[in-house]
């Protein structure tokens, strides 16, 4: 008897860790050294967590052996509540905050609690693909609105408006954006929120990169601009505090919660079912948010992340036929390959061919639900020497590549 995967997974996809990565693992098993530009995982690139965070987690391990409240430790949630005040998000109490095993778990929970079969959710293209996967897994229909590369990758408000239907339940905003690195202006956010207001949409705001900003870019929390809208804000420690392996994130519910009691009860139920988030990592939150913000040393001159972002941008734009909008935040670049110079029909095949030829791992643009096979994503985490070697390999490969 054959056992097949559930039909619920028919439209679920997460190609950041997809078939190309499987080939990379096989090559590593054969003894090849793979230069990895595929995942925003700071620690393997030498970005260590602040010592005080690690020390506090170690110090609290003896008291972290049991379950916590399903929403999380009071002290950690209070620290998040105080962070809401810094970000000017109004009306948030301790009970409006949920701690999770990373933002990923909370995204899936929030979609499972909200969506019925056929409900539509507006998601940016390109996006962080977990958003699309979570909507599909919950029985919803992801509808992708275009971000405009010619306008610094800002979302196209007209495209969002055109894609709203009677079935649309929610609008997803990823700011700073993964994979493009765009940081949205106040005017843009207000325009997006006005569409949500007109059509009574729930707003999901992914703000995991809110402290990773370059060139004096300013992050504005979506919920701070819309106290009248139900807004779910997602953030965590993985990127800004370099502890992705801790799986420590949070969800903040703001706005008219009295209109969403049934939905919130659904989130509560799912939070209870998974018992609680990883308790040792919850002890990192108060120290991280209340301590010295060492991320600023990395993103302000002469910080390492800033230097690597700059070099990545310069090197990509030096490759004939490749152009890249300068990322203003996050840990990625999302360059375009001019189809007139190097026509690519299948960008997953391009990523695999690059891996096999150059032992270099990137992620194809369609993995981020970009509709055309003309982009790819690289992380800006490697040291400058490795970035120069990697992007040099991409340039050499494209010189002779054809499909």
Give, region by region, the residue ranges found by the protein language model.
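PLP-dependent enzyme catalytic core of the Aspartate aminotransferase-like
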Residues: 86, 161-162, 343-349, 353-362, ...
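Active-site phosphate-binding strand-loop segment of PLP-dependent enzymes
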Residues: 143, 148-219
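Helix C-cap/helix->beta junction micro-motif
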Residues: 27-30, 138, 198-199, 229, ...
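Conserved PLP-anchoring active-site segment centered on the Schiff-base-forming lysine
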Residues: 113-135
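Conserved core segment of the aminotransferase class I/II
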Residues: 227-303, 313-314, 398
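Conserved glycine-rich beta-strand-loop-beta hairpin in the small C-terminal domain of fold type I
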Residues: 286, 303-313, 324-338, 372
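N-terminal small-domain helix-loop-helix segment of the aminotransferase-like
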Residues: 2-102, 109, 276, 288-291, ...
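A short helix-loop-beta submotif of the ANL/AMP-binding
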Residues: 137-143
């Amino acid at each position: 008897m054959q056992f097949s995967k559930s039909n619920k997974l028919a439209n679920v996809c997460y190609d950041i860790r997809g078939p190309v990565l499987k080939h990379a693992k096989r090559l590593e098993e054969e003894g090849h050294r793979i230069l990895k530009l595929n995942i925003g995982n700071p620690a393997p690139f030498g970005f260590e967590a602040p010592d005080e965070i690690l020390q506090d987690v170690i110090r609290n391990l003896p008291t972290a052996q049991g379950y916590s409240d399903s929403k999380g430790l009071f002290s950690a949630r209070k620290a998040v509540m105080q962070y809401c005040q810094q970000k000017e998000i109004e009306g948030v109490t301790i009970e409006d905050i949920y701690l999770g095993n990373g933002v990923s778990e909370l995204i899936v929970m929030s979609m499972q609690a909200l969506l019925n079969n056929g409900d539509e959710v507006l998601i940016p293209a390109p996006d962080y693909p977990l958003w699309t996967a979570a909507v599909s897994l919950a029985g919803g229909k992801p509808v992708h609105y275009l971000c405009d590369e010619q306008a610094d990758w800002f979302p196209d408000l007209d495209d969002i408006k055109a894609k709203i239907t009677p079935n649309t339940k929610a609008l997803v905003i990823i700011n700073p954006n993964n994979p493009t690195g765009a940081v949205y202006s106040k005017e843009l956010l207000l325009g997006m929120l006005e569409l949500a207001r007109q059509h009574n949409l729930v707003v999901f705001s992914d703000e995991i990169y809110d402290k990773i900003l370059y060139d004096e870019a300013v992050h504005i929390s979506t919920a701070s601009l819309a106290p009248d809208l139900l807004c779910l804000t997602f953030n965590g420690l993985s990127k800004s505090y370099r502890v992705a392996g801790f799986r420590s994130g949070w969800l903040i519910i703001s706005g008219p919660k009295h209109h969403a009691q049934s939905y919130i009860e659904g989130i509560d139920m799912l939070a209870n079912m998974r018992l609680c988030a990883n308790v040792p990592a919850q002890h990192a939150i108060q120290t991280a948010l209340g301590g010295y913000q060492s991320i600023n040393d990395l993103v302000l001159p002469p910080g390492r992340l800033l230097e690597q972002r700059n070099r990545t941008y310069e090197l990509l734009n030096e490759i004939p036929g490749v152009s890249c909008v300068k990322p203003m935040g996050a840990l990625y670049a999302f360059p375009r390959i001019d189809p007139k110079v190097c026509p690519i029909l299948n960008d997953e095949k391009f990523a695999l061919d690059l891996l096999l030829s150059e032992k270099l791992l990137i992620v194809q643009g369609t993995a981020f639900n970009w509709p055309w096979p003309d982009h790819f994503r690289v992380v800006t985490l490697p040291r400058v020497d490795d970035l120069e070697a990697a992007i040099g390999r991409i340039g050499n490969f494209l010189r002779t590549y054809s499909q």
